């Protein structure tokens, strides 16, 4: 069976394994206070046009989101998210467990819009009794979204303007950040994110690392005490250099971008095959997640050779499924899938 169900079904990129092996007999100080974490921070900062930021390394995305958002907010403040936002659907109530309400707004093509955010923020101010309500304070975005769609620079600038107008923090979940920044139509850079967000994280788990995410805190208001809050929540890895070394390997020669770009290109080949076969795509995007509408029979046929992910039932005869490529996807695997799509009834 060939796996197209997600982008974290392999270990790590060979260059990362090589770096880990070569340094395995060396000893370092703990808790991300080591040369490799410093090198990784510097390599990332090289892409931020000199922005003054703090960078913290953690294990996984849900951990980053739960720790960061709880640290950034007062107990009575809430988070604006798309209904299909990862924190709203797929983090087992991690945010709510910290005591914060998620205000879920209907997504437009998988994304929030500046108008939706402004309307929600204005409704709070117009309520007549805001002191009886949670205060919307942070906007949560994912790019790519849960449906592979991405934000343009203009969309982010519009959302930033609304956040400034209403005093909201802007936070971006970057679990699949590489697949967005490497997409053929992406006009956003890491430097733009450092300019437009208050905090964002650079995903490693889904982009070549064994595990690991790099949280970039831009807004100075959000930095004080963050390391201690992370430790209190169990998010500080004693052997922190294992994370720093991985991110340094990904960013020292832009490996992060080349391996995710290849995944995007392979995903486009899959999408093209589905479209040429007369099938409908649920969303249009240029990243590594492709959502297609299949008949039950077509899904059963492809399911004999490939593992892919069910998304939702369309009707009694059709379902929407996700095919996902990654840094580890082989060209031959995609070629075989394309061949089977072409002969599929």
Language model features with spans:
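Conserved core of the PLP fold type I
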Residues: 53-73, 103-110
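Active-site C-terminal subdomain of aminotransferase-like
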Residues: 108, 135-136, 142, 150, ...
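Conserved C-terminal alpha-helix-loop-beta "cap" of PLP-dependent enzymes
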Residues: 74-76, 268-343
């Amino acid at each position: 069976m060939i796996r197209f169900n997600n982008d974290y079904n392999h270990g790590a990129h060979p260059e990362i394994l090589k770096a880990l092996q070569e340094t395995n007999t060396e000893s370092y100080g703990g808790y991300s206070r080591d040369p490799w974490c410093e090198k990784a921070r510097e390599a990332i900062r090289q892409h931020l046009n000199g922005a003054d930021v703090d960078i913290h390394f953690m294990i996984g995305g849900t951990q980053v989101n739960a720790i960061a958002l709880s640290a950034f907010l007062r107990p009575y403040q809430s988070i604006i998210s798309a209904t299909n936002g990862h924190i709203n659907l797929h983090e087992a109530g991690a945010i709510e467990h910290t005591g914060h309400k998620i205000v879920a707004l209907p997504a437009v093509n998988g994304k929030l819009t500046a108008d939706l955010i402004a309307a929600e923020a204005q409704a709070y101010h117009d309520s007549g009794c805001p002191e009886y309500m949670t205060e919307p304070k942070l906007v949560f975005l994912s790019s790519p979204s849960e449906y592979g769609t991405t934000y343009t620079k203009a969309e982010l600038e519009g959302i930033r303007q609304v956040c400034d107008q209403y005093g909201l923090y802007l936070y971006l979940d970057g679990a699949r950040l590489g697949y967005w920044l490497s997409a053929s139509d992406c006009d956003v850079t890491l430097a733009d994110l450092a300019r437009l967000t208050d905090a964002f994280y650079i995903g490693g788990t889904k982009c070549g690392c064994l595990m690991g995410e790099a949280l970039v805190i831009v807004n100075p208001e959000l930095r004080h005490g963050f390391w201690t809050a992370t430790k209190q929540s169990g998010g500080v890895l004693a052997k922190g250099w294992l994370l720093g070394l991985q991110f340094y390997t990904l960013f020292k020669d832009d490996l992060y971008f080349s391996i995710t770009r290849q995944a995007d290109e392979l995903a486009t080949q899959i999408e093209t095959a589905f479209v040429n076969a007369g099938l409908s795509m649920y969303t249009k995007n240029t990243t590594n997640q492709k959502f297609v509408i299949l008949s039950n029979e077509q899904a059963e046929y492809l399911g004999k050779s490939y593992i892919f992910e069910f998304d939702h039932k369309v009707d009694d005869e059709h379902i929407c499924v996700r095919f996902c490529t990654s840094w580890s996807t082989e060209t031959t695997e995609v070629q075989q899938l394309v061949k089977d799509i072409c002969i599929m009834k």
